[in-house]
């Protein structure tokens, strides 16, 4: 149960945050046209809301850990690192999606399909032990696989992940966040024309 719930909690945070962040600009069109404030405030506010929901979702996970006898060790503190990296990655995705949504209204429908496929390509409901060895390298390129696996190692195994896991988490977070900031900055001055 802990293995499954960990995957569900973390992936739900990803889908909820990106879904809310995608409409951060378009749903605030009237306000953006009337009042000037930095436009990145809108996606950030959505991220904060999703982060609160993540915190609330972690409580049932910890309760299940207690009932299943999963040890509460120092490795749980490493979840802070994992969540911080995931926040950077998710923020980058939100900036990319909110920009795309402003210019292309169909982004919302495309993303619903992409996010569902992404979920099936991430070991949320199944163990990564069933993944063929020749395909495992492609799974390692999936940031959500990295974040969820990192969390599972900390929670279930009660140990620190390998150093390469830290590197993967940081790289995917920084790269996607920087890309999101770049694209958002390039497009934000044109938002008003498309709202």
Named regions from a protein language model:
Residues 33-34, 65-66, 99-103, 153, ...:
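Transmembrane helix-loop junction
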Residues 2-3, 10-15, 44-45, 74-82, ...:
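Short alpha-helical transmembrane interface motifs in multi-pass membrane proteins
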Residues 39, 45-114, 159-182:
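Alpha-helical transmembrane segments and their short interhelical loops
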Residues 1-67, 109, 113, 119:
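Hydrophobic alpha-helical transmembrane segments of multi-pass membrane transport proteins
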Residues 188-195:
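Short cytosolic juxtamembrane segments of multi-pass membrane proteins
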Residues 120-167:
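Short hydrophobic, aromatic-rich alpha-helical segments embedded in or entering the lipid bilayer
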Residues 9-21, 87-100, 120-129, 180-181:
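Transmembrane alpha-helical segments that form the membrane-embedded catalytic/substrate-channel core
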């Amino acid at each position: 149960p802990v293995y499954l719930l960990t995957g569900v909690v973390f992936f739900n945070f990803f889908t909820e945050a990106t879904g809310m962040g995608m409409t951060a600009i378009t749903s605030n069109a009237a306000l953006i046209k009337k009042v000037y404030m930095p436009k990145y405030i809108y996606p950030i506010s959505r991220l904060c809301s999703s982060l609160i929901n993540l915190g609330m979702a972690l409580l049932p996970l910890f309760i299940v850990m207690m009932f299943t006898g999963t040890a509460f060790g120092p490795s749980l503190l490493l979840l802070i690192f994992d969540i911080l990296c995931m926040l950077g990655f998710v923020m980058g995705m939100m900036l990319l999606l909110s920009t795309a949504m402003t210019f292309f209204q169909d982004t919302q429908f495309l993303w619903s399909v992409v996010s569902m496929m992404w979920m099936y390509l991430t070991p949320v409901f199944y163990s990564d032990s069933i993944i063929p060895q020749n395909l495992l390298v492609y799974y390692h390129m999936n940031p959500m696989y990295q974040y969820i696996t990192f969390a599972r190692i900390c929670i279930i195994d009660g140990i620190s992940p390998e150093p390469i896991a830290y590197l993967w988490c940081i790289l995917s977070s920084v790269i996607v966040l920087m890309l999101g900031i770049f694209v958002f900055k390039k497009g934000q001055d044109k938002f008003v024309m498309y709202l």
